[in-house]
């Protein structure tokens, strides 16, 4: 054996990067025999001897790698010669498919070959043909090619034989077998996926690998700018989807990012194994992908068409500090910091857990809405959560006067001065101009003016703001000399400045530098004096005040001009003090804090962390007061209010917007010490957090930032206050910063958008210590680790949400419920109450009373009774109709007992317990055998378990549909029941939605001239969604607080969207967070009760007396006969247009398919239409295939339990099966076995497996009952039905068309229909109105024109066989304008069109509409002047 040939093969295998394990297994005894090179054609042919025939996957990998490696040099072909030429049948079958795939065949022959798996026997490949001609053709096309192919893959000794089989059944048998195998493979894949989904705790042992091993170095995604033949990338998968194609193949679509850019990666499956692997590609994985970059034909942008994808491990940031030396982050912002932070509370806590941090604080801006999620995450990950807030602290009032003295304001002399400086910091900046005027009796009696030399070049900002240039100050006196001269000149007069704290800060700092005492003169601040005297102004800047008071201001931001203007301003303000009877300097601060002074105080950030349970409650009070009592632009917290509720709360100094940091930066250490005395601990943050201050010219360089931080640390040591290093975290990782930049950039008025944002990721212990290396290792460790742990240890374990349900207490509720139930039962069923009724009542009452739910029922009963007493029916939602106690207390009209007859007069009753009747409403009419009167029919056969669970211990969720007109009255009635401080609207949190985030991303890209790939846009959109944007209120949810508790025991409160004019206060927490703690009453508004009330008013009929089995009414659910029209006339095959629940196109199609004739069948339709995977692909196919009829299919969730119990299954198992099926969890094998034992048909079992969500029967019953009542009016009182429909349900009208009648309406419908998806939203909404208008006109009714003196503001009025439209049906005329017209006409006849427009406040467009349609016929354009 020639050793050199083996070496050559070894080098070749290394060159093409063949995996070592493949070389060892299949090439150890192989050698490269020769290479034929055809230079002219650029073709190389390799001849390689191998030990055995290669498995197909290895062959494919080797062949592909060989071709790819030499692709730029030559076209490569390969011949393998195997010593052992045996090939396992499984491999030869795969090789056969590969051979066919690369062989040119006509579609007909390809299908014939691929439709069969050839038999392998005695080194022969046996194919089947249908006749001799076909066999000959196949052999001719394939025999020689197959022989060559076998030689090339290992000199295989196989030959091709074609056998003629005329037995078509044999061919079909094979196809069936192949289809079955394919189906089994699909089922296996689905089952494996389901198993993985159910058992996510057991990860796959092997990382994902599709295709060949990738050893290429990846490029960064931002380098992809053009099409490429072969590149490798790696990235984080943020979206993954698998699409099943009609060809039977699967398409994997990945969106991945490496945070330089993102790209879409596509891959087609090559076989069933690929398809199975595709399902395991998940969001959150890191992958390496190799393939070509090409322009995607669908997105028209660059994407990767991958050949190989492998899951990879990418090292993440870890906290490598020892367990006892890890920091605690005490200052974080989450997605609940409004439009500011982009990390969720759960993600923050999870990251802390990954790093081994024992605790983390949540301190969102002004709110605590992140607490519940953080709490749950803390429990899940074993991390102690500290609950806090970054509040906006304001002084109750800013002093008008300083150094108060007994000085007469009218007689004294004032020194009104102004300084121009190099910056805002009295510590690091200096005075460059000082000017002043002396004022006495309103006249300027002296002036002082001087520049001062700063001894450095002025910044452009200073030059632009002040107009002072370097030339003006270079030869000026020293600052010290200017200050000495001014000190002498000012004497003991009263000092005055506009925003005196700034000017006095520079003055006193300057005095101290020349060893003078601080000025002890009395001081007046004209800024605060103006705020006190002129509160009506929007701002109190000097130029605004001068303009308002007609004072000349020649050159703003030059000291002498500002001083003169301030002097005249002062005197005008002093004169106004006369009205307040204020004449002495000592009296000025007596009025500090008046006129909502908190609105004028500048907010400072401060951190509040609850230390105890009492502290948590106080925190909730403080958040509530800030939102309810002191909201102005942001929730503000007056210092006195914080002081009052400070018990159990730690107060920290917060960030650069905190007053301690600002005082240290701009004033003096002495003043900073005075300010810091208010706080419990001092926060310092990484220098990077403050670099934006340089850009804002608040500090000059980083060394000043470090100096301030050193001073703060020293101040803490001096005052014995704990100093902690905090991160002011707004996102997890540095690459997440871009999301925050986009959010901030979307807010034009946000001051953060004007400057570069600081870096505020969640830092590890080492990263944080490195930030403070300038303090020395010991001090850095102290503030980063020791002090944060010490502060954490001082805080109790606290839960922000309560355990258990706290319901309001109504004395005697339990007995009252019993009395109500039995009194009603006796009234309906007589005495003695039938045992079946007693049994059901006792079963329910035992659960309701035993679990403390009686009061919940009783409250609902009182609300419903109030509505009924006021003349409005109430519809129930959800499963409350499953409760017979709810029926007997009149909470619901749905009766869940088995179908039955009962006599209203003598109480004779008959119950059907065998399941033979589905709904009592479908029982045939029958006279009472006792008294001969007609029997009442009732009962929907709904088990109680579907409402409160099998044990009856589930908290009842009673949803009630009140009329939309009555809903506000029902809400306010709860205040009467419980008191105004015990009821609140359930709060909601509105977050940035995907569409909104998309707008932000595109806007950000446009503003910054970025061009993003679609995948990158999608990534950025994901990063911006879920951030708190606003707050709101649940449409009907009322939260009730027990009388022995306060709302602050559970949640803070606020106004919805911070609207202080709102009638209701809401819970600060999203109501889902406290759903299990406080009773929520769902007092919802709904159109059905409003329509019923209007029909009642128009007809005088009691809706409760409307029959539920009217024959003509039932006909409209399967045809149009009872409406007196044909389907062709109204373009609809049923008569249910406008009937709630049954008027949509989807449900109308269901009605056409099923043709229901009974109330029970309508219940099934309702259930089918609201469920998921209950009708489509399930019940619809069962009915169409004739397997069962509509009454047999599963419609509502309760049907399952009732059906299985009738079949003989144990009630507990029947309930459990129902619960699993309705939630889309399918069936367990043991349940299927039990169902089959009790003769449950296979189709029923398969139907259960497909269902994803099911509608409760009680809900369906309540809706259908309302629908049947309304349908009754449509059939028997049509004009009333149309009046009610158009008044209550319709929003869009086209009166021009509707008035013209059927032909015009039909034409307009066709116009809109032809547009399809191009129709506007308004046109799509209009379509339904036009369809019902057409039906109305075809039934012989018509629309009139709007009448100026007869039309209602909002209601369609019946006039014979016509409807008179209201004013708000006019396009562009809203309800308020409509009400204004009616109100104006009540005051007298309109004199002219001008008079109409002026008195009713309608627009010119609306006036023209009324005029063009003859509504203003004979009316003059303008008022006529009458002469007497």
Swiss-Prot record:
GO terms for cellular component: cytoplasm. It comes from the Bacteria. GO terms for molecular function: 3'-5' exonuclease activity; DNA binding; DNA-directed DNA polymerase activity. The gene is polC. This is DNA polymerase III PolC-type. Belongs to the DNA polymerase type-C family. PolC subfamily. Required for replicative DNA synthesis. This DNA polymerase also exhibits 3' to 5' exonuclease activity. It catalyses: DNA(n) + a 2'-deoxyribonucleoside 5'-triphosphate = DNA(n+1) + diphosphate. Residues 414-570 form the Exonuclease domain. Keywords: Cytoplasm, DNA replication, DNA-directed DNA polymerase, Exonuclease, Hydrolase, Nuclease, Nucleotidyltransferase, Transferase. SMART domains: EXOIII, POLIIIAc. It holds the Pfam family tRNA_anti-codon. Its main location: cytoplasm. It is found in: Cytoplasm. GO terms for biological process: DNA-templated DNA replication. Its EC number is 2.7.7.7. The keyword rRNA-binding does not apply. Gene3D superfamilies: 1.10.150.870, 3.30.1900.20, 6.10.140.1510, Metal-dependent hydrolases, Nucleic acid-binding proteins, PolC, middle finger domain, Ribonuclease H-like superfamily/Ribonuclease H. SUPFAM superfamilies: Nucleic acid-binding proteins, PHP domain-like, Ribonuclease H-like. It comes from Oceanobacillus iheyensis (strain DSM 14371 / CIP 107618 / JCM 11309 / KCTC 3954 / HTE831).
